Amino acid sequence: MNIIAGFQNNFSEGLYTKFKSYRYRVFVEYLGWELNCPNNEETRIQFDKVDTAYVVAQDRESNIIGCARLLPTTQPYLLGEIFPQLLNGMPIPCSPEIWELSRFSAVDFSKPPSSSSQAVSSPISIAILQEAINFAREQGAKQLITTSPLGVERLLRAAGFRAHRAGPPMMIDGYSMFACLIDV
């Protein structure tokens, strides 16, 4: 497995195109999210900017098998703009020391998991998360914040990551979701 972390301009055009197609396949086709995606790939959407950071995992054949997006909370980000209610009245983080981790996926389409918990706890997902933490730390982050399904909390702790809730879980679109802080 090869994992690359960097800003969009650090990726070749070919890899970035494969990455957008992978995200479309995961989030639109596999998870059923309703996103405006022409040409069966995710184009730059609300939080994808030139200075957005990504983590991309590839297998030995260079197929993408996982990804994540990283944004400093000093610019608009998913939790702060779309799901602030998950913070339970806490001020929306806005600090170069807190980065948002979003669009996290660890789906290897050559052998998809039988459950979402397997996808989150797989060696691929642990490696992607560790690389995201390392990259964010290099940028000066001390914490990551995510919008996550509740089961992720238990899996993060089981994998040895220091994580805690930023607010109580809430039902969003039929899922028990929470804001999770992960120490970097």
From Swiss-Prot:
This is Acyl-homoserine-lactone synthase. Induction: Expression is activated by AHL signals in a positive-feedback loop. It is an enzyme of class 2 (transferase). The gene is abaI. It comes from the Bacteria. It comes from Acinetobacter baumannii. It catalyses: a fatty acyl-[ACP] + S-adenosyl-L-methionine = an N-acyl-L-homoserine lactone + S-methyl-5'-thioadenosine + holo-[ACP] + H(+). The lineage of its organism: Bacteria, Pseudomonadati, Pseudomonadota, Gammaproteobacteria, Moraxellales. Keywords: Autoinducer synthesis, Quorum sensing, S-adenosyl-L-methionine, Transferase. Belongs to the autoinducer synthase family. One of its GO terms (molecular function) is N-acyl homoserine lactone synthase activity. Gene3D superfamilies: 3.40.630.30. Disruption phenotype: Mutant fails to produce any detectable AHL signals and is impaired in biofilm development. One of its GO terms (biological process) is signal transduction.
